[in-house]
Amino acid sequence: METTLGEIARIIKGELKGNHNIKIKGISTPENPKENTVVFCRNMEEVEKAKEKASAVVTQEEVKDFPHIKVKDVKLALAEFLEHFFPEEHPWGFLRTPASEKELEIGMGSFIGDFVVIGKNVKIGRNVKIYPFTYVGDNTVIGDNTVIFSGVHIYRNTVIGRNVRIHSGAVIGADGFGYHITQEGIKKIPHIGGVIIEDNVEIGANTTIDRALIENTLIGKNTKIDNLVMVAHNCKVGENNILVSQVGLSGSVKTGKNVILAGQVGVADHVEIGDNVIVTAKSGVANNLAPNKTYGANLPAIEWSRWKRIYVYLLRLPELFKKITT
């Protein structure tokens, strides 16, 4: 994209403070601002980060001596910006072109099974195996020696490294769960980012890894992900992680190196987990976890009649505590 700050202000119905003719060539994030881009900021801390490189910001605040567009609702403005400048494209008509007849880059020794559908501008390395009924979206890159089993769905703008194994039913790069509640209803926030899966990663059956809002959801090298794991948009999973079945990572979670999340661990959005952390099964992680420790908070099953008695006492704890302290 290439536009002006004035045109952006018109599209998102904001109040422009600065030169209308500033050239804008894209969007970036407060964490990673880039030159010639606009950044949508939720607070002044993000504004200060964005000012280091970005050409302008969109914010609810007044910003001194820096080009900005002032809006009432930053999330709504972001959704309107993405809808206008990055519209979702869909084909029309009947497309029956087999993968073998498309202009693809396919390395020596690779195999593409029956009923595989491959989009445009896809690059496939050497000795890659793609089994039947798999979908590979536009602008995807697949590294050498990677194996993709039957029925995998890989959305556009996905980068898969070397020696990766993706099992049946996995979905890579679906839209992140991003919505904003307005007076008119629930507004979808378009996701224009992608997914990067580094070398030597294994992804289990029916696992889902969502695309990022603007940049990339990342799975670090040598990480192993079990079946039925959910990785939400903007997550950064570190190297050598183990994510056991039914783990759920909310949006923008970051994990360090050598992290182990046991079965059914749930992690709240924007939480950071340090290196060498182990979280025991069924634990909920609501806050950042310091490195080199084991964490856990779960309730193992006990005899039902006993639990009901304990529960009665739990409800009386505030009353009992008050009696003890007075």
Swiss-Prot record:
Keywords of this entry: Acyltransferase, Lipid A biosynthesis, Lipid biosynthesis, Lipid metabolism, Repeat, Transferase
GO biological process: lipid A biosynthetic process
Assigned GO CC terms: membrane
Annotated EC: 2.3.1.191
Reaction it catalyzes: a UDP-3-O-[(3R)-3-hydroxyacyl]-alpha-D-glucosamine + a (3R)-hydroxyacyl-[ACP] = a UDP-2-N,3-O-bis[(3R)-3-hydroxyacyl]-alpha-D-glucosamine + holo-[ACP] + H(+)
Biological pathway: Bacterial outer membrane biogenesis; LPS lipid A biosynthesis
HAMAP family linked to this entry: LpxD (MF_00523)
Protein name: UDP-3-O-acylglucosamine N-acyltransferase
UniProt source species: Aquifex aeolicus (strain VF5)
